[in-house]
Amino acid sequence: MDVTLDTMFRGRLVVRQEKGGYRFSVDAVLLAGLAGVQSEDRVVDLGTGCGIIPLILAYRKKGRSIVGLEIQSDLAELAEWNVSTNRFSDRIELRNLDFRKVS
């Protein structure tokens, strides 16, 4: 898989994502910024992709715990790398599964 290494917030957030195919855009950044998430909320991100929304929420100290669900294993691997590299493993949990099977 060909990937790029991008940064946000003046280099304080590092994000690895596919060079082609699914890449996050300004929509995900706006959604994370406009979400009415408080510091003690629990959050689930369905179809988390590379984990950009949980990463932004954790960076902005929103959400006590965040779970990202991703069905595509290659994207789930990128999300795991991003969470670990940015040291948010204590607040973000990622699962490689089909959210339709969550009960």
Show which residues each predicted segment covers.
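Conserved SAM/SAH cofactor-binding pocket of Class I
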Residues: G33-S103
